[in-house]
A protein has these predicted regions:
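Acidic/glycine-enriched connector segments
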Residues: 1-104
Length: 104
Protein backbone atom coordinates (compact mmCIF):
# COMPACT_ATOMS: atom_id res chain seq x y z
CA UNK A 1 0.00 0.00 0.00
CA UNK A 2 1.41 3.38 -0.99
CA UNK A 3 0.95 6.31 1.38
CA UNK A 4 1.23 10.09 1.33
CA UNK A 5 1.80 12.16 4.48
CA UNK A 6 0.94 15.84 4.80
CA UNK A 7 2.64 18.41 6.92
CA UNK A 8 2.84 22.08 6.23
CA UNK A 9 2.90 25.62 7.43
CA UNK A 10 0.21 27.24 9.50
CA UNK A 11 -1.97 29.71 7.59
CA UNK A 12 -0.38 32.83 9.04
CA UNK A 13 3.05 31.72 7.74
CA UNK A 14 1.96 31.38 4.12
CA UNK A 15 2.21 33.95 1.35
CA UNK A 16 -0.53 32.41 -0.82
CA UNK A 17 -4.27 32.34 -0.34
CA UNK A 18 -6.10 29.32 1.01
CA UNK A 19 -7.79 28.87 -2.39
CA UNK A 20 -4.43 28.75 -4.21
CA UNK A 21 -2.99 26.24 -1.77
CA UNK A 22 -6.09 24.03 -1.81
CA UNK A 23 -6.08 24.01 -5.63
CA UNK A 24 -2.42 22.97 -5.60
CA UNK A 25 -3.10 20.28 -3.00
CA UNK A 26 -5.96 18.91 -5.08
CA UNK A 27 -3.79 18.71 -8.21
CA UNK A 28 -1.05 16.86 -6.32
CA UNK A 29 -3.47 14.53 -4.51
CA UNK A 30 -5.16 13.64 -7.81
CA UNK A 31 -1.72 12.94 -9.33
CA UNK A 32 -0.84 10.73 -6.36
CA UNK A 33 -4.08 8.78 -6.81
CA UNK A 34 -3.26 8.32 -10.50
CA UNK A 35 0.17 7.02 -9.44
CA UNK A 36 -1.45 4.41 -7.19
CA UNK A 37 -1.43 6.05 -3.78
CA UNK A 38 -4.49 5.11 -1.72
CA UNK A 39 -3.78 6.14 1.87
CA UNK A 40 -3.28 9.74 2.94
CA UNK A 41 -2.10 10.71 6.42
CA UNK A 42 -2.66 14.16 7.91
CA UNK A 43 -1.07 15.55 11.07
CA UNK A 44 -4.28 17.59 11.55
CA UNK A 45 -2.66 20.95 12.30
CA UNK A 46 -4.25 24.21 11.16
CA UNK A 47 -3.48 25.10 7.58
CA UNK A 48 -2.03 22.69 5.05
CA UNK A 49 -2.69 19.55 7.14
CA UNK A 50 -6.42 20.21 7.51
CA UNK A 51 -6.82 21.58 3.98
CA UNK A 52 -5.24 18.41 2.59
CA UNK A 53 -7.49 16.25 4.78
CA UNK A 54 -10.54 18.12 3.49
CA UNK A 55 -9.48 17.56 -0.13
CA UNK A 56 -8.91 13.84 0.49
CA UNK A 57 -12.32 13.51 2.13
CA UNK A 58 -14.06 15.35 -0.71
CA UNK A 59 -12.38 13.18 -3.35
CA UNK A 60 -13.15 10.01 -1.40
CA UNK A 61 -16.78 11.03 -0.98
CA UNK A 62 -16.94 11.60 -4.75
CA UNK A 63 -15.85 8.04 -5.45
CA UNK A 64 -12.06 7.95 -5.32
CA UNK A 65 -10.91 4.69 -3.68
CA UNK A 66 -8.75 6.41 -1.05
CA UNK A 67 -8.50 6.57 2.74
CA UNK A 68 -7.64 9.26 5.26
CA UNK A 69 -5.72 8.59 8.45
CA UNK A 70 -5.89 11.46 10.94
CA UNK A 71 -2.74 11.38 13.08
CA UNK A 72 -3.49 14.05 15.68
CA UNK A 73 -0.86 14.90 18.31
CA UNK A 74 -3.23 14.39 21.27
CA UNK A 75 -6.88 14.68 22.26
CA UNK A 76 -7.82 18.33 22.76
CA UNK A 77 -5.06 19.51 20.40
CA UNK A 78 -7.50 21.99 18.82
CA UNK A 79 -8.88 23.59 22.00
CA UNK A 80 -6.95 26.87 21.67
CA UNK A 81 -8.01 27.40 18.05
CA UNK A 82 -10.76 29.64 16.73
CA UNK A 83 -14.24 28.09 16.52
CA UNK A 84 -13.92 27.93 12.73
CA UNK A 85 -10.73 25.88 12.86
CA UNK A 86 -12.14 23.71 15.64
CA UNK A 87 -15.12 22.91 13.42
CA UNK A 88 -12.92 22.05 10.45
CA UNK A 89 -10.73 19.84 12.64
CA UNK A 90 -13.76 18.04 14.11
CA UNK A 91 -15.27 17.51 10.65
CA UNK A 92 -12.04 16.07 9.25
CA UNK A 93 -11.62 13.82 12.30
CA UNK A 94 -15.21 12.60 11.95
CA UNK A 95 -14.69 11.81 8.28
CA UNK A 96 -11.34 10.05 8.67
CA UNK A 97 -11.19 6.31 8.11
CA UNK A 98 -8.75 5.93 11.00
CA UNK A 99 -8.00 8.35 13.85
CA UNK A 100 -4.87 8.02 15.96
CA UNK A 101 -3.75 10.26 18.79
CA UNK A 102 0.03 10.11 18.90
CA UNK A 103 0.51 11.10 22.57
CA UNK A 104 -1.77 10.17 25.46
Amino acid sequence: MRRVCFTGHRPEKLNKSEAEIVASLEREIRAAITDGFQTFISGMARGVDIWAAEVVLRLRDNGSPIHLIAASPYQGFERAWSPSWQHRYASALAGADIVRFISP
